[in-house]
Amino acid sequence: AVIPLKNQGKCGSCWAFSTVTTVESINQIRTGNLISLSEQQLVDCSKKNHGCKGGYFDRAYQYIIANGGIDTEANYPYKAFQGPCRAAKKVVRIDGCKGVPQCNENALKNAVASQPSVVAIDASSKQFQHYKSGIFTGPCGTKLNHGVVIVGYGKDYWIVRNSWGRHWGEQGYTRMKRVGGCGL
């Protein structure tokens, strides 16, 4: 289960949205509670990342672990710009994170079968940016520059959740060709 789609706006915070989506989902799987968590807290407080200028999933997870948790979206709402880090509740905790070997489709498929998984893709092509529907087959390269979440898969494609709002793609999702598409 995932929270309704969100939109990162003009802030380069895909790393925070992708990380938070997986933590929300893992929390729902473990507790049965689907709670919208704060991307803004990561943008403001994950100092090893770069706020709206980009970041890394592993550093975001490490922030959540070291901080003892992350607050809700309601308590620490998204602003689409980096502000000062402020005190926040620790509503949902994680105790670790595990990577999936790059370019290993079976490992990724096994991970996605048990929970949504964050991945970096090459989203620089105009075709991806203006994607509307169908199985996205490219063109795209392997310059990993955008964080998304794989929430499922079909025979020939991954079901990928983006953070560009419901107007993009298939209600904010895309189906991406499996077998090495866009850096996967």
UniProtKB/Swiss-Prot annotation:
Q: Which UniProt keywords apply?
A: Disulfide bond, Hydrolase, Protease, Secreted, Thiol protease, Zymogen
Q: Write out the annotated subcellular location.
A: Secreted
Biological processes per GO annotation = proteolysis
Recorded hits in InterPro entries, A to Z, give:
Papain-like_cys_pep_sf, Pept_cys_AS, Pept_his_AS, Peptidase_C1A, Peptidase_C1A_C, Peptidase_C1A_papain-like
What regulation of activity is recorded for this protein? Repressed by the active-site-directed cysteine protease inhibitor E64 (L-trans-epoxysuccinyl-leucylamide-(4-guanido)-butane) produced by Aspergillus japonicus.
Tissue specificity annotation: Laticifer.
Record's Gene Ontology CC terms? extracellular region
Q: What is this protein called?
A: Ervatamin-A
